[in-house]
Curated annotation (Swiss-Prot):
SUPFAM superfamilies: Staphylokinase/streptokinase (SSF54328). This protein is not a protease, but it activates plasminogen by complexing with it. As a potential virulence factor, it is thought to prevent the formation of effective fibrin barriers around the site of infection, thereby contributing to the invasiveness of the cells. Keywords: Plasminogen activation, Signal, Virulence. The keyword Signal applies. This is Streptokinase. Residues 72-94 are annotated as: Disordered. GO terms for cellular component: extracellular region. Residues 1-26 form the signal peptide.
Length: 440
C-alpha cells in the first residue's frame, strides 16, 4: 500500500486544495451536549450507568439534559440530536407534551458514553435499557413506556424529569465489511491552543478543508498532518509555531465510533475499510455509488516565536500569602493558611454560598470549615516582609438569625472611615491593592 502523500507534494497539495476550496465551518461536536438548562424549559435529566453484559463491571456516564420544549426544524433535529419523531405534541386537553422515542434516548446515551473515550479500546456499545431504568418527576411519579416503546412527558407546567437506572452495554466490535468502499474523501480540521495561556492569542474558528481523495489502505503520516497544521497556522498566525500535538481523531462517514490516533508518538493512519456509500441520484432517484468520507480532527499546542515553553514546576511568578482569621474580641486564631497565587486581583473576599466568587481567595465566613457564626468586621491588617505578604482578617460573631453573608462591616457607625478604607481595597471598591509596604 503506497503513501498517497509525501512531503515533496505539499506545495502541489496546498495549491490545489487550499487555493481553490473555500473553507466551510465544521460541525461543532455532539449537538445534545448542553450547558445549564433554561428555567423556562422542561428538561429530562439523564443519569444512568452502564452494565457490561455478562459481567459485574459498571461503566460510569456523565449526566446530561434533554430539552423537552424545543421544536425541531422540519426534517432536522432538536438541540440534542433527537429526530422529529421525538418532539413536542398537543394532547387532547390542549396541554403540551413531549414524545420521546426509545431509539433516540439510547442513541443520546451512546454518544455520551463515548464522548470521553481516549483510546480505541475504550468503546462500549449500548444494547438496551436495563430493567431498573425509570423515568420519574420530582414528586416520584413513574412514567411508563407505550406499546411503541415511546414515553410521553408533559412539558407544562415547566418541570424536570429524571431518567435513572442502567443501560446494558458490551465491548464494541466493528461489523464485517461486505462491500468495501472504493474512494474516500479526506477532510481536515484543526484548532490551536496557546501553550502559555497567552490571552493575546485568539484561536481562529475551526475550519474544514478537503485534503485529498484516497483509496482504502492508503495512508497519511503524523508528520504530514503536523506540516499541514503548521501551514494553516502560519497563514493565520505567522508569529506562532506548533510545539506538540494534543489529539488526532478520525470520524468515518459520521460514524460515532471514531478512530483515536496516538498523541504522544508518531503514527501512520491507514484509510479504514468500510461499507461503500451510496447516494440517490437527484434526477432518477436511483441509488448510486458516492465517495465515502473521513474527517481528521486535530488539536495542537502552539507557542509565540521567542517565548519560553510553559514549565508546570516554575513557581517564580507566584507570590506567597499567609492568611489568618482572628476573633476580634478574644484575638484567638480561628484559621490560618498559606497560598501561592499569580494574581493579587484574586485577593478579595468570597462568599462560600455564592459560586460566582469561587476565584477569590479570602472568606467572608468560615461555616464551610465548621467554624460557625462568624462574619467580617471590616478590620483587616496587611503586612509584608521580603518573601511573604500576611493578611490578618478580624472576624466577629454575627447576630443571631443572620445568614453567613451578613457583614458587620456594613454598619457605618461601628467603624471609622480609615478602618473601612483598609478593608475597601480587599473588596475591590476602588482603593488600589498595595504592591509593597511603601505604597500603603
Amino acid at each position: 500500500m503506497k503513501n498517497y502523500l509525501s512531503f515533496g507534494m505539499f506545495a502541489l497539495l496546498f495549491a490545489l486544495t487550499f487555493g481553490t476550496v473555500k473553507p466551510v465551518q465544521a460541525i461543532a461536536g455532539p449537538e445534545w451536549l448542553l450547558g445549564r438548562p433554561s428555567v423556562n424549559n422542561s428538561q429530562l435529566v439523564v443519569s444512568v450507568a452502564g452494565t457490561v453484559e455478562g459481567t459485574n463491571q459498571e461503566i460510569s456516564l456523565k449526566f446530561f439534559e434533554i430539552d423537552l420544549t424545543s421544536r425541531p426544524a422540519q426534517g432536522g433535529k432538536t438541540e440534542q440530536g433527537l429526530r422529529p419523531k421525538s418532539k413536542p405534541l398537543a394532547t387532547d386537553k390542549g396541554a403540551m407534551s413531549h414524545k420521546l422515542e426509545k431509539a433516540d434516548l439510547l442513541k443520546a446515551i451512546q454518544e455520551q458514553l463515548i464522548a470521553n473515550v481516549h483510546s480505541n479500546d475504550g468503546y462500549f456499545e449500548v444494547i438496551d435499557f436495563a430493567s431498573d431504568a425509570t423515568i420519574t418527576d420530582r414528586n416520584g411519579k413513574v412514567y411508563f413506556a407505550d406499546r411503541d416503546d415511546s414515553v410521553t412527558l408533559p412539558t407544562q407546567p415547566v418541570q424536570e424529569f429524571l431518567l435513572s437506572g442502567h443501560v446494558r452495554v458490551r465491548p464494541y466490535r466493528p461489523k464485517a465489511v461486505h462491500n468495501s468502499a472504493e474512494r474516500v474523501n479526506v477532510n481536515y480540521e484543526v484548532s490551536f491552543v496557546s501553550e502559555t495561556g497567552n490571552l493575546d492569542f485568539t484561536p481562529s474558528l475551526k475550519e474544514q478543508y478537503h485534503l485529498t481523495t484516497l483509496a482504502v489502505g492508503d495512508s497519511l503520516s503524523s508528520q504530514e498532518l503536523a506540516a499541514i497544521a503548521q501551514f494553516i497556522l502560519s497563514k493565520k498566525h505567522p508569529d506562532y509555531i506548533i510545539t506538540k500535538r494534543d489529539s488526532s481523531i478520525v470520524t468515518h462517514d459520521n460514524d460515532i465510533f471514531r478512530t483515536i490516533l496516538p498523541m504522544d508518538q508518531e503514527f501512520t493512519y491507514h484509510i479504514k475499510d468500510r461499507e461503500q456509500a451510496y447516494k440517490a441520484n437527484s434526477k432518477t432517484g436511483i441509488e448510486e455509488k458516492t465517495n465515502n468520507t473521513d474527517l481528521i480532527s486535530e488539536k495542537y499546542y502552539i507557542l509565540k516565536k521567542g517565548e519560553k515553553p510553559y514549565d508546570p514546576f516554575d513557581r517564580s511568578h507566584l507570590k506567597l500569602f499567609t492568611i489568618k482569621y482572628v476573633d476580634v474580641d478574644t484575638k484567638a486564631l480561628l484559621k490560618s493558611e498559606q497560598l501561592l497565587t499569580a494574581s493579587e486581583r484574586n485577593l478579595d473576599f468570597r462568599d462560600l454560598y455564592d459560586p460566582r466568587d469561587k476565584a477569590k481567595l479570602l472568606y467572608n465566613n468560615l461555616d464551610a470549615f465548621g467554624i460557625m457564626g462568624y462574619t467580617l468586621t471590616g478590620k483587616v491588617e496587611d503586612n509584608h516582609d521580603d518573601t511573604n505578604r500576611i493578611i490578618t482578617v478580624y472576624m466577629g460573631k454575627r447576630p443571631e438569625g443572620e445568614n453567613a453573608s451578613y457583614h458587620l462591616a456594613y454598619d457605618k457607625d461601628r467603624y471609622t472611615e480609615e478602618e473601612r478604607e483598609v478593608y475597601s481595597y480587599l473588596r475591590d471598591t476602588g482603593t488600589p491593592i498595595p504592591d509593597n509596604p511603601k505604597d500603603k
